[in-house]
Amino acid sequence: MYLTQNKLKFGIQNGLNVARAGYTEDQILTACILADKTGYDSIFYMDHTNVPQWKNATVLDPWVMLSAIAAVTQNVELGTCVTDAIRRHPSNIALAAISLDRVSKGRAILGIGAGEAQNLKEFCIPFEKPVSKWEEQIQVIHKLYDSTPDNIVSYDGKYYKLEGACLQAPPIRKPRPPTYMAAGGKRTLAMTGKLGDGWLPIGYTPVLFADHKAQIEKSMNENNRTQEEKDNFQFALDIDVYFSDDAEQSWAKMKEAVKVSLFKPEILRVHKLKEIEGFDFVKYFTEYSMSDQSWIVKMREAATQMPDDVARSSIALGTPEDIIPVFEEFMKAGVNHFVIRFWGKNYFGSIDKFATHVMPKLRETAKKQNN
């Protein structure tokens, strides 16, 4: 069953792929212009302070870069993938999203997650109660979207408070810039169904995506979301694509990184894999940082024990003919908005090749399945 009530969407992600390659700002903008002209629906930008595993990477502010991208594009939606909620006050995030929405003439998306230690530890920002803070953040942000001097808003949360607050720049997009939540656990998936307009995870197999999608839909029903909200909800996925003439050779290059990205308790659960002894997932996500890279070594050692067939189902490698079936499996699992990280030396060529040889066939597949 294909979930494509809405138009099937494709976007590009300027994330670790771009940071690691060291592309200049001009090169990134050129890639985004190409995506806008070749039929992509969205462009996303990662939000990190650093990437500890690659010391020579270039890491830029997403809101500044997305505003620059807005100035040179006309059609694509523009979003963060994803903003780190715990690092900023919700008023800053709300105003940044509104500002992007206005300069882009109504094309902004707020991709937001709870955060991770690597963006916080050396900056002495406490990584405490991130999920509870994230939930309050989204509630505050949504209130501030509707605020004006004549419609001041208040909020009395445990971590955030507003007392007659307002912003003075209403968003263009109605009812608001959509909120895509980066959820991956039982509690955050329920929050996504309650508060989100979309879901944007990373490191998923089709099996895990379908499982978590069902949890979100259950929460949407429990929270009495309207039919319109359900119909417009974006089940997005940050997915890796590596074009090459030899899929096996590409898999050999990407194998370790893919397993590290995929390695999480929920993957072990849905694929009925044994727990990896001696690895503490909670400590990894709360302690891994630039100053303590021992955790990435531990992660690599543990992740290599994951079966190849499970890991490989999460990534699209090889020729267009190799890649299309991978996307079709995710479409069956419920993805209706693909956010693609292109890997390899030819970023521009990959953007064009996907638009020319993959995108039309997937759109046709979705159209046939829904007729």
Give short role names for the model-derived ranges.
Residues 10-14, 43-45, 78-80, 108-112, ...:
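Hydrophobic faces of well-ordered beta-strands that scaffold small-molecule active sites
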Residues 1-72, 76-77, 177:
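N-terminal beta1-alpha1-beta2 module of alpha/beta enzyme domains
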